[in-house]
Every structure is written in C-alpha cells, then in structure tokens.
Amino acid sequence: MIPTLLNKQTLQLINRKQLKYSLVMAEKDYFLALALKVLEESKLYNKLVFKGGTAIHHCYLEQSRFSEDLDFTSLDKDLKATDVTDIFKSISFFEVKKVYTSKATIQIERLKYSGVLDQPNSLKFEIDFIQNVVLPPKQMKYTNVWGFDIMVNVMDIREIFAEKLRAMSDRARYRDFYDFYLISEQYNLDMIETINLVKQKEIRKPISKESILRNWKVVSEQKEEEINLIYYRQDIFNNEQGIEKLLKCLNFTTIS
C-alpha cells in the first residue's frame, strides 16, 4: 500500500532530528523512498537489481552521504519503457516528464513529484541493460527515516565495490572515492575477488591503477567543489594518507 504524503511540519521535524539536510534535499530523500515503495509493489520488483549511490547509502552504509538517483540493472533484457513508466501512472504525486531509451538504457530523466514544499523537483530513474549482474542480488531492507517498510532487490556489496573500482578509473568524482573508501573500511572485502568480479563484468574501456591515482589527484585538488554540492556525513580527506595508501596498494596495473 502506497502511503499518504506527510505534511511540512513532519518533514521539518524528522529532518531536524535525524537527517539535517536542507529541507529540499530531505523532501527528495522522502520521495526516493516513495518511488522505491511503488517499485516494490509492482511487477518489476524481481526484474531490477538496485545499485549505485542510493543503494549503497540506504542498504549498506546508513546514509553516510546523500544520493539523489535510483540506479538499476535489468535482469529482463526485453523490458520496455512503458513497463517502467506505467508503474507510476496511478500515483497522484508522481508524473513522468522525460524519458530516454536506447539499447543500453531506459532513463526517466525527470520523474516529477509534487510535495509539501511546492517547489518543482524531480528524481532520476535509470535502468542499465549492458552491465551484467555476476553475483546473486540480496533481499535487503531499504533503511530510511520516514518509517516506510521497503524491501529491495539490491546488488551484492562485493559487486558494488567492483563497480566503484571501475568508476574511479573512468571519472574523477569525489563520491566514488568516498564510497570506495567507506565500503573498504566497513566491509572486509578481498581485493583479488574484487578484481576477478571486475573482469567478469562489461569493461567498456581499460581500468588502470594509473588512471585511478590520476583521478584521485584531480579529486583532491577540486574537492571543495563537489563537497559543496552533496551532503557528506564525514570528510574522508581527514584521512587522506589512508586513502592514498589504499589506492597505491591496489594489486593490478590494467584490467581490460
């Protein structure tokens, strides 16, 4: 059953006591949970594997940072865009405004929501068809401060860790290094197994230790720019030497 919307006073109270986000960000966190509740009660639940930043921080790391996208890999390669958009049709507070499709993805680029703040806003809902899922997904609780009981079909943390390794090589984003470091701190993951998992997944371009270290240097020089864009519970640069040691200990040169 999809819950009714909370009022502004309750949003403010819960945010002040628990999240301490901006109110706009807190409302988005609330609608992320609602969108996943809609998914849980739909026919798509067992067809999509939840992954990415929102999955990490609501299933594995207890909201150590804010993440605003819903990312999935589809187990059903014949899934159509209408299969996805239809689950939101009967939900009064959601409106699908912009959809992009290709052989590689279905993206609801703007899943507009109408909340108590009366400010136009939207979520991004992205489904990947190219990236395979190697390990069996986990049935886990989506932790949230809003009191919703939500179960998700989420990617195994070992495979998420492997995807973060690839992401650090592909791009220079603080959030990737942040997630990789916190996962390595909280979970005793084997790096050899991680590299083997990377090799079993779709590799679109070579993954190299050199590019990871180069991207970390860029992130270190431009850290304030991204830190100011997204809420982070802690500053991993307080342990910058520990992160550099972790990255330099990566026991591979190139994966292709």
PLM region descriptions:
Residues M1-L48, H58-S64, E68-L70, L75-S256:
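Structured mid-to-C-terminal alpha-helical surface segments
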Residues F50-T54:
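Glycine-rich beta-strand-to-loop/alpha-helix junction loops that act as flexible
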